[in-house]
A protein has these predicted regions:
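Extended, helix-rich architectural segments
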Residues: 1-172, 498-501
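Charge-rich, acidic-biased intrinsically disordered regions
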Residues: 26-27, 44, 133, 139-153, ...
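Surface-exposed loop-to-helix/strand elements on domain peripheries
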Residues: 91-94, 99, 304, 328-449, ...
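Residue-level preference for well-ordered alpha-helical positions
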Residues: 104, 364, 393, 417-421, ...
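Short coil/turn segments at secondary-structure boundaries
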Residues: 116-119, 130-132, 287-295, 373-378, ...
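Extended, regular secondary-structure scaffolds
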Residues: 122, 127-263
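Extended, charged amphipathic alpha-helical segments
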Residues: 226-389
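Activation/maturation switch segments at domain boundaries
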Residues: 452-501
Length: 501
């Protein structure tokens, strides 16, 4: 994404003074997230003929793994919403207790939100951006009630977010650059959100993407007749909350510029990520170069001469020739005067394993996942759930990072409810209470929780139906039914055995 081109476009057309320098940091983070940093992973080595060749440095791609782990910790299939108004809850989540229906299901919200957390954690910021398709507007561009309309969401990382106005740390106006396909060709959708006198104006512009001679993508604005159906150039709404919400990793940015944007979760761990890849590459190279080698006197070999008159020696075993190495003199050998000698290099597995483990521990610590998030023992990885020594660090950092995500989730849900009521005519309450129920299995595992609930049920501290619901994923009604059936069966058994056999 050539975001600099759109910054230049906005500065020119809207007389802004946006700066593109901070997006250079985001590009570096993107390279680390992909596991391909040219200055690090493109190694220069001397070839036998004296030329310089490139070798790809092996990479564990830990920055991406770290972002995936944070996304799975913070927003996963066990994250649920609690909405006070029943009709509003049914509209968003569906009527079942598993919250698998409603508008959020139509939008594939949870899987997209999980991906957005990963993108926000590598890029420094994520944005939920709402739009309404098939909206009716008057001649002035004001949005009118549109029962035929449909709510849509975009999920943008920091490289697609251009803050325009920031008040007390909160982005109030912004532009969003979203990539898409139109007619099988790449295109870009630029949406600008501005506020004037309590009214919000959303401007939509489309650009087609072409490749310049230099290889840099060029963007040319499309005319209205070529844009997607169901979109308008501009709409204005009054009394609405922001149609976007942003969140970032919960760390104070120590980089200059980029007001309104955050920094990557691994921004402070780039040296540790580099150490991980160097240690892993060294481990890999030791294994690759550590095969058996046989040094032999060239007089043992059959000779042949090519058409240019150069003599070549044929190794004793042409199939496994990579293990044979010629000695330059007929008398020579390594440490002995023998015609041939076998050599088995030491792989140094213990030292290499420890180097990789030390680097992973540093990476885990710097990315706020605790000191031993990634610990390999006998071929298995021990996560922080089992390693109690680092659990407290993880718990504190996870709780801290839930705050901005919860704010963003509630913000975009209120925008969706406002549009649903005021534009689509849905029977919802935008002011209804909304809270997020987080998954805390990183603190106590599901098995530990179930076992404790079972003990409490046996002791009479909690109803048995609660244990059944948790153990077998039952609804409250199903759990009560199971409890009643179990009680009836026990009474039947007592009646059958009353008075003896």
């Amino acid at each position: 994404m050539n975001v600099a081109a759109f910054i230049e476009y906005l500065n020119k057309t809207k007389h802004l003074h946006l700066d593109a320098d901070y997006y250079g940091n985001i590009e570096v983070w993107r390279q680390w997230w992909k596991g391909d940093v040219p200055d690090i992973h493109d190694q220069k080595e001397d070839a036998p003929d004296g030329s310089v060749i490139s070798r790809r440095l092996a990479s564990l791609r830990m920055p991406k793994h770290v972002c995936e782990d944070w996304a799975n910790l913070l927003l996963n299939d066990k994250t649920t919403l609690q909405i006070g108004d029943a009709s509003t809850s049914a509209y968003l989540l569906g009527s079942d207790e598993q919250q698998t229906g409603g508008l959020l299901r139509q939008l594939h919200f949870w899987e997209n939100a999980n991906r957005l957390v990963e993108q926000a954690y590598w890029s420094g910021t994520g944005a939920f951006v709402m739009s309404v398709e098939n909206l009716t507007v008057d001649a002035s561009g004001n949005a009118l009630p549109s029962p035929q309309g449909s709510i849509r969401l975009d999920y943008d990382p920091a490289c697609c977010i251009l803050p325009i106005s920031v008040e007390r740390g909160v982005v109030t106006e912004a532009a969003f650059v979203s990539e898409c396909m139109m007619g099988g060709k790449p295109a870009v959708y630029l949406q600008t959100h501005t506020v004037r006198n309590g009214s919000r104006t959303i401007t939509n512009e489309w650009f087609e993407v072409t490749d310049d001679v230099s290889g840099t993508p060029k963007f040319s604005k499309l005319t209205e007749d070529k844009t997607l159906p169901g979109t308008v150039k501009s709409i204005t709404v009054t009394g609405a909350p922001a149609w976007f919400s942003l969140f970032s990793p919960a760390a104070v940015k120590n980089l200059d510029g980029g007001m309104g944007l955050g920094m990557s979760i691994f921004s402070e761990a780039l040296d540790a990520a580099q150490m991980v890849d160097y240690a892993f590459d060294n481990y890999r190279q030791d294994i690759r170069l550590g095969g058996k080698k046989i040094f032999y006197d060239r007089s043992l070999c059959r000779k042949w001469v090519d058409k240019e008159g150069i003599e070549h020696a044929v190794p004793p075993d042409a199939v496994h020739r990579q293990i044979f190495y010629e000695l330059p003199t007929p008398e020579g050998g390594i440490d002995q005067l023998a015609a041939w000698r076998e050599y088995n290099p030491d792989l140094r597995t213990a030292s290499n394993h420890q180097a990789v483990q030390d680097a992973l521990d540093m990476m885990s610590f710097k990315c706020k996942l605790g000191c031993h998030r990634y610990k390999f023992d006998q071929g298995t990885v021990t996560t922080a759930t089992e390693y109690t020594g680092s659990r407290q660090d993880l718990v504190q950092n996870a709780n801290k990072n839930q705050i901005p995500i919860e704010t963003a989730l509630i913000g975009i849900l209120r925008a969706m409810l406002w549009a649903a009521k005021n534009l689509l005519g849905a029977p919802v309450d935008p002011e209804s209470s909304i809270s997020v129920n987080w998954d805390d299995s990183y603190i106590v595992s599901e098995q530990e929780r179930t076992n404790q609930l079972r003990e409490d049920a046996i002791a009479g501290l909690v109803p048995r139906c609660r244990y059944l619901a948790a153990r077998y994923s039952l609804s409250e009604d199903e759990a009560h039914q199971w409890t009643a059936e179990a009680k009836a069966d026990s009474h039947t058994d007592e009646a059958l055995t009353f008075g003896g056999a």
